[in-house]
Amino acid sequence: MKIVRIETFPLFHRLEKPYGDANGFKRYRTCYLIRIITESGIDGWGECVDWLPALHVGFTKRIIPFLLGKQAGSRLSLVRTIQKWHQRAASAVSMALTEIAAKAADCSVCELWGGRYREEIPVYASFQSYSDSPQWISRSVSNVEAQLKKGFEQIKVKIGGTSFKEDVRHINALQHTAGSSITMILDANQSYDAAAAFKWERYFSEWTNIGWLEEPLPFDQPQDYAMLRSRLSVPVAGGENMKGPAQYVPLLSQRCLDIIQPDVMHVNGIDEFRDCLQLARYFGVRASAHAYDGSLSRLYALFAQACLPPWSKMKNDHIEPIEWDVMENPFTDLVSLQPSKGMVHIPKGKGIGTEINMEIVNRYKWDGSAY
């Protein structure tokens, strides 16, 4: 299966209103799709996110010339070379070559990986809670209410981007709106030190619906993570920027996390992403993929979760949920899956089992201008 053509699709959308987290406001969303085509006509799609000018130059000047003429079945060695140049680009290539392998074998991605344990996966609605409005709390509450009406039973909201007192006011308002039957995840984006993060414990002891506390501290403080995990009454999660299982090993060995959160687009390819999930099972901790930046990478996270052994024997709580971006972002619809009552059914067709929405691709193609 010789690679004969590679197409690129840099996509850009400027937001109507900025939204954000503790790292600041987002004013646009981007996506970079690639399509690898073999001499037999079998194709596969990949996705990554980074600064579009750098990605486009990297693909057109180096990665595409390197891949042309290579065998699509040599995924591991090709991805290993590309990750030395650009890790996120390597992840996109990994996805595309995985789909080609599945189509060549006349099966789905899940079947290529040995088959699925389950037909559907739970997802949680992921919010960027902060806005530049003085009434940001009421706006956040309205956004959450709208998604709860669509059937979501788990949500993730942001903390750590404003004063502790104001964050508490925000979460109390959401608790009043959502009720204790809705699982709530709090994501601090590494904003705190250990003392500030521990202040939340007084509220965790009252709120019975907290799913986990996500990335409360920078990861250069593993001893504080271990201490915090031992003292909090809710699970501690994190690791969305880890590049592979080797970076998780010291964190898991020191018992820093209850839940690891690898991201398909942040690790060194889909194979290492799956290695991260399996590593969690070996250490007896949970794995809930971070999947905020792209719909195709989220689909691969869903495939991997479908093929992952259960973490528990508890009925209706044996597999961890996957993140589902519900903010303004047209690229979330590049893949035509939609949750129903907080669950997503896994496609069964060949390859990824669905088509890329070319209408969205054509509408939002980046024109090369500065942003």
From Swiss-Prot:
Q: Does the keyword Oxidoreductase apply?
A: no
Which superkingdom heads the taxonomic lineage of this protein's source?
Bacteria
Q: Which CDD domains match?
A: MR_like (cd03316)
State how it assembles. Homooctamer.
For this protein's source organism, the top of the classification is: Bacteria, Bacillati, Bacillota, Bacilli, Bacillales
> What cofactors are annotated for this protein?
Mg(2+)
Q: Give one GO biological process term.
A: carbohydrate catabolic process
The protein's name is Putative isomerase YitF
- Does the UniProt entry include the keyword Metal-binding? yes
